Amino acid sequence: DLHYIARRQRQMCIRDSYKKGKFVSIQLYNALSFNFYYLGNKDESIEMWNKITQISKVDVGYAPWVIEESKTVFESRVLPLLLDDNNHYRLYGIFLLHQLNGKEILMTEDIWSILESMNDYEKLYLTYLVQGLTLNKLDFIHRGMQRLYNFKQFKYNTSLFTDWINQAEMIIAENVDLVDVDRYVAAFVYLSYRRSSQPFTKRQLMDDFNVSRYKLNKTIEFIL
């Protein structure tokens, strides 16, 4: 493989400089860490990355294995959602893209063209995420997704997230106060799982979402 040979040769030059004590810097450790990682030497890659974090006083970005994990998640989960015909799937895809560490590296011209071809609502959500616009309705949907994402068992459950977007839009249409998203997400999760083989108890959800039994019951009634 020509890429492997080129990376191996580059690694030999970098290591030679490192051993001779030349140009010992954050850039050198960074190059060593990335080259070690892609040559299959993760332990040495971690060692070099640790040196960066020890000497740097500023944010040094993400380690190569973190970026590689983001690439895997992007290709297997995010991209299919962004290309889906259903706009709720696309919104969830935009949300997941925003969660990825080192996402800037993934933003090729092809990905930008996909995002630029989306509808106005999806572009508005992108702008909300990037620029921090005050958009109460999209903010409510987003905060709900963020709460779901914080739970490991939910974070890649596509049907749960797209159902939440649909449910959130119905809640918004009722013109209720949208500040307290936790009560709505807790009630939504309870109703989503109540007929499953592993339903959540109200006590579990009260603890997980810091919601009182009264609020949870009232919100379940409201959604029903």
Q: Would you name each region that the model predicts?
A:
Residues 1-16:
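Single conserved hydrophobic/aromatic residue that forms the stacking wall/gate
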Residues 8, 30-35, 60-69, 91-101, ...:
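Structural detector for internal amphipathic alpha-helices that build alpha-solenoid repeat scaffolds
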Residues 102-123, 177-224:
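Extended intrinsically disordered, low-complexity coil regions enriched in Ser, Thr, Gly, Ala
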Residues 7-11, 42, 90:
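TPR-repeat structural position
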Residues 19-28, 54-65, 90-91, 104-107, ...:
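Boundary/linker segments of alpha-helical solenoid repeat arrays
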Residues 145-185:
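Intrinsic, low-complexity N-terminal interaction/targeting segments
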